[in-house]
């Protein structure tokens, strides 16, 4: 017996949509949604394909996701070609199976079933889909959100289909995410010969005490919803490669994953104060890729918890751990945002896979969420 969720997932996997190339995935989704009465507005920007689709009026529940995937890596190490979906022992293998073509298929099939049962639903059901999430994320969801906000669109609830689960579907639901702030720091010195240090100024030596203090800072202790803010040095570089040249500059890149206990401005001020304390000559470049956001217990969280418990008989953990997602852009609209998707154990890995029955379960959960909020 065929399963529409599995079949649609397989159709999507067969399209090698390496970010930001959609490779025809959205055309499949659009065709299915239009067939059940959705109005679809393509919102393509540059090399990125996006669409906004809706059906009905009133309080709005949007489902958000991305059709793009990361590269497959060494295809010889896959048990089957990464863009040829294969089911083995109940597991569906293929790039994007878990992140996040399985979720997209579950969303669309859930919407089809929901509309069939509730053709005159009271609220508005919507989809926000992009092909630019895995790479730069510059022409995707963020641009669609900006356009929707500019024309006064209202979004009350948003379910993002990112693979949130840990062991079984729904055991972890993300009801927020930490902010992400990157600092590109250059410490300036004076290049010279290592045998004549008095004629040079080594930026590595000057910066070492400051960096030592930086990595030891306790930024906050987190709170009920967020773990403590963390700072990690990601890249550090100095020198010419020669063993007899004192470097002229030291380049350090570090990233903060910060909680709602801090703002990006508070972090910036503290870093600058530290640089001034050690009397360093420096250049700073900051990149804020996302503010922290949190969806407290309310109608959306309650609907998600109810759906998970109904079909999997477990109470999900509400967590804010992990990296950033497009939820950070959608939260700007004032919407309640929650992430619920398949198990994330193999995402971005060789032999990415998802339990086929989990996708069927996910479609039922998504449909129940629709029924609770916009039926």
Curated annotation (Swiss-Prot):
Keywords: Amino-acid biosynthesis, Cobalt, Diaminopimelate biosynthesis, Hydrolase, Lysine biosynthesis, Metal-binding, Zinc. Zn(2+) 1 binds at residues 66, 99, 162. Signal peptide: none annotated. The keyword Nucleotidyltransferase does not apply. GO terms for molecular function: acetylornithine deacetylase activity; cobalt ion binding; succinyl-diaminopimelate desuccinylase activity; zinc ion binding. Zn(2+) 2 binds at residues 99, 134, 348. Homodimer. Catalyzes the hydrolysis of N-succinyl-L,L-diaminopimelic acid (SDAP), forming succinate and LL-2,6-diaminopimelate (DAP), an intermediate involved in the bacterial biosynthesis of lysine and meso-diaminopimelic acid, an essential component of bacterial cell walls. This is Succinyl-diaminopimelate desuccinylase. It comes from Cronobacter sakazakii (strain ATCC BAA-894) (Enterobacter sakazakii). The lineage of its organism: Bacteria, Pseudomonadati, Pseudomonadota, Gammaproteobacteria, Enterobacterales.
């Amino acid at each position: 017996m065929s399963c529409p969720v599995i079949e649609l997932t397989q159709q999507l996997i067969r399209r090698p949509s390496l970010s930001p190339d959609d490779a025809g995935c959205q055309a499949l989704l659009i065709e299915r949604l239009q067939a059940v009465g959705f109005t679809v507005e393509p919102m393509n920007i540059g090399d990125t394909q996006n669409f906004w689709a809706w059906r009905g009026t009133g309080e709005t529940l949007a489902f958000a996701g991305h059709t793009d995937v990361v590269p497959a890596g060494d295809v010889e190490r896959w048990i089957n070609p990464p863009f040829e979906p294969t089911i083995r022992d109940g597991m569906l293998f293929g790039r994007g199976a878990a992140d996040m073509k399985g979720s997209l298929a579950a969303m669309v099939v859930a919407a089809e079933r929901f509309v069939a049962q509730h053709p005159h639903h009271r609220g508005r059901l919507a989809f926000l889909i992009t092909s630019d999430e895995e790479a730069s994320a510059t022409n995707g969801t963020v641009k669609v959100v900006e356009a929707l906000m500019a024309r006064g669109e209202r979004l009350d609830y948003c379910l993002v289909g990112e693979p949130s689960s840990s062991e079984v579907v729904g055991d972890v639901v993300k009801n927020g995410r930490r902010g992400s702030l990157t600092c590109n720091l250059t410490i300036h010195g004076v290049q010279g010969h290592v045998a004549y240090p008095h004629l040079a100024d080594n930026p590595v030596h000057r910066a070492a005490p400051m960096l030592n203090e930086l990595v030891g800072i306790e930024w906050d202790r987190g709170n009920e919803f967020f773990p403590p803010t963390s700072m990690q040095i990601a890249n550090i570089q100095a020198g010419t490669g020669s063993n007899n040249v004192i470097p002229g500059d030291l380049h350090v890149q570090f990233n903060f994953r910060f909680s709602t206990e801090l703002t990006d401005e508070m972090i910036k001020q503290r870093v600058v104060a530290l640089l001034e304390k050690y009397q360093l000559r420096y250049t700073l470049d900051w990149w804020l890729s996302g503010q922290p956001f949190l969806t407290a217990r309310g109608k959306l969280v309650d609907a998600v918890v109810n759906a998970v418990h109904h079909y999997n008989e477990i109470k999900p953990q509400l967590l804010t751990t992990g990296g950033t997602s497009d939820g950070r852009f959608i939260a700007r609209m004032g919407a309640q945002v929650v992430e619920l998707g398949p198990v994330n154990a193999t995402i971005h890995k060789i032999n990415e896979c998802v339990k086929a029955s989990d996708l069927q379960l996910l479609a039922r959960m998504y449909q129940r969420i629709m029924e609770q909020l916009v039926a």
